[in-house]
Amino acid sequence: MLTKRFYNLAIMQDISNHTPMIQQYLKIKSQYQDILLFYRMGDFYELFFDDAKKAAELLDITLTARGKSNGESIPMAGVPYHAAEAYIAKIVKKGLSIAICEQTGDPNTSKGPVERQVTRIITPATVSEEAFLDNNQDSILVSIFEKNNKYYLAYTSYTQGKIYLVKTLTSLNELKNTVLKLSPQEIITNSRELAQQNPFKKPIKALEEWYYSNFEAKKYINDSLDTNIANNILNLYKNDQLTTIGSILSYLTNILKDTPRHITDISYEQEQDTLNIDINSRINLELDNNSKSSLLSIIGKCKTSLGSRLLKRYFSNPTRNLNILATRHSIINSLGENQHFLKIQDVLSYISDIERIISRVALGTVKPKDLVALRYSLEQLPILKKLLSEKNTPEITNINNRIHQLDELVTLLDKAIIENPPTTIRDGGVIKEGFDKELDELKSIKDNSYDFLIKFEELQKQKIGISTLKVGYNRVHGYYIELSKQHADKIPTEYVRRQTLKASERYITEELKNFEDKVLSSKEKALAREKLIYDTLLKKVIEYYKQIQETAASIAEIDVLANFAERAIKLKLSQPKFNNLAKLELKEVRHLAIEHNIDEPFIPNDTLLSKDTNTLQIITGPNMGGKSTYMRQVAQLIFLAYIGSFVPASYADICDIDTIYTRIGASDDISSGRSTFMVEMTETAYILNNASAKSLVIMDEIGRGTSTFDGLALAKACAEKFAQMGAFTLFATHYFELTELAKQYPNVCNIHFEAKEYKDNIYFMHKAVTGAAKKSYGIQVAKLAGISQDVLESAKQNLYNLEKKQQLTESTQVQAQFQLEPTTQNPLQQKLDAIDINTITPLEALNILFELKKR
């Protein structure tokens, strides 16, 4: 059997022992070794050899064999052409790529196998069809150009028609965080090592060197982009940045087998305007995962796919640009007046994904039903614009001016396309009657054929006197006159036998044959005419590409902000303020997910962090008391403020925060051989090395997984570091000894979460109170968890014995415990250690004592 090794060498080796069709297949397959080849044969796409085995497993289809070639059976699997989209979608969603090989030659004129060639490559990030895409998520292709230990990164949201350039990255960890934040469907790179390691756990491939040639990059930029845009890009960016941009354009050109004309904009992401959150913190804070308790699932109630995707972009890149935030807040307030957003959301709910529809037009993958959806969506725009004009603010007017009322296009589509068109243009039936006179005439020939056949049949019955004569049609033999064999003696000479059946004969006459030729010819001509009209229509639609893209972007923006206005009222959110006083003052803060999922009222808490008072809170109290919730809700509030949403607090005055770091939870990294403690220390080291005075740091119980003294020592050292750097830090701990730091550092304060005991039960107050906790309540929490009574009684006795022996509660011992071994010995200690008391004289001792006193 042939193997992948054979594919690699197919061109170089003798393949003459195979059938001509398999020879053709192997030559094509050798050019697409790492992806599945869908090879068109009649009404099926067939896969052979290892591709067939893989497809059978992935798609749960039958693996068969197609005869023999080179003396061996050929594994084969196939899917129907008309149903291929659903199968391709399954493969693409698994992160795999496909080459579509179509029959491009004419079977009637071909000598040997019909000519075939790959007309399209489908990869996870380069799809535009609705079946392949998540409506609420961008389809992201990332390109990474590694050079001199630096990473140049660009990405495109394929159907959005834009390429974004990211700042140059200098570490693998920074690269990993940036890529995972984008959550791409596919990654390309010039680095084979990076592709092999794949730290992103996403589909990644290393491309040939020419894709990352600066010369080729500039060529593709010039060929793919509008002249003015291309010239601007070439003058604006450095060579390595241009190489990265060009790699995306060259890759798309190769995939599409055409120039990616739908790319109309290149922009640079300014990091200094962004609130940075690494991937671990995103996971810890449950910002945008797929769970029902994620912040995105609670905040994201947009009415359009356009808005849902834009909201995800807001979540990926929260902005610190106060002008942008002020604009969003102004619009939210305007739309919230008299709940005006409700009328807007009602209109938005009728608008389809016009951004992706117009991209499909540009990419040649649009379907007739897409054009109907486009028309219906554009019909909503006058209503939407009128509603927006009722709120005559500069901010809303600016958005409204970018929504284009495309009445001419609506009229064109309404006249051209029937209301419920077929899935494809392949068999016609898409263009509305009355749109094209020539097409109507060609269709009328077929439509009027029934009347002709009725009259023709009646005339033949009268002519030969046989009432059972029938005129019919089948796809194989065409039109015919059918007579029983018992009437063979009455057959006119002009009847020519066409088909013999068991009890009857079928005939054709010259008149019927001429009619058949006319009808079949009209069908072919009508189909050709309809396809020509359809192609011409698409060319007309694409003239509105930029206007529709701009309209789509504006609809997305108003959808997100109407959603924010609705959420503000529904969830009782308030508008945050921003200050330049290095102060974070929050009142009655709530955790939205927990509030949403509990029956009893949520207990809010205040938080105050300030450079003038305290920047670090040591948070103590029992498990389940509310420490983690308190810290998370502060971080989530800051995040919401920086995406432009209102926030879950009665009052929020926020200073400039550039990064949110969190160290929460405990888990092993088994695949990398790292223990829970090692994972914790690695993440802590990352935070310590990167945090600044503008950071918000969440640290939850640092120092677990090692000995008590080691853990306490590390926790204290970390807390001191954060206190010294002035980062706003919420530091939860069960090491009560850390509460002593408030006496040593003026910017450290203690808060704790209270619990009340009644008999043997514990009741959590979930309220943050100034000062340190006095107990941990671990045994009481264990009781709530269901630990058996005998174990609890034993634990109580153990606790009593330990507390009795424990001397660390004395303040002097606490201080002693904090005295970690110094890195250098005290000079006085060195002098004393050097004295030999067995040989020193009393006079020498007095002199030494005098010297020490002078020091």
UniProtKB/Swiss-Prot annotation:
Matches recorded under InterPro entries: DNA_mismatch_repair_MutS, DNA_mismatch_repair_MutS-lik_N, DNA_mismatch_repair_MutS/MSH, DNA_mismatch_repair_MutS_C, DNA_mismatch_repair_MutS_clamp, DNA_mismatch_repair_MutS_core, DNA_mismatch_repair_MutS_N, DNA_mismatch_repair_MutS_sf
Role this protein plays: This protein is involved in the repair of mismatches in DNA. It is possible that it carries out the mismatch recognition step. This protein has a weak ATPase activity.
GO MF annotations in UniProt: ATP binding; ATP-dependent DNA damage sensor activity; damaged DNA binding; mismatched DNA binding
Domain of life the protein comes from: Bacteria
Pfam family, one: MutS_II
Family matches, as SMART domains: MUTSac (SM00534), MUTSd (SM00533)
GO annotations of cellular component type: cytosol
Residues holding ATP: 621-628
GO process terms (BP): mismatch repair
Keywords attached to this entry: ATP-binding, DNA damage, DNA repair, DNA-binding, Nucleotide-binding
Name recorded for this polypeptide: DNA mismatch repair protein MutS
Family affiliation: Belongs to the DNA mismatch repair MutS family.
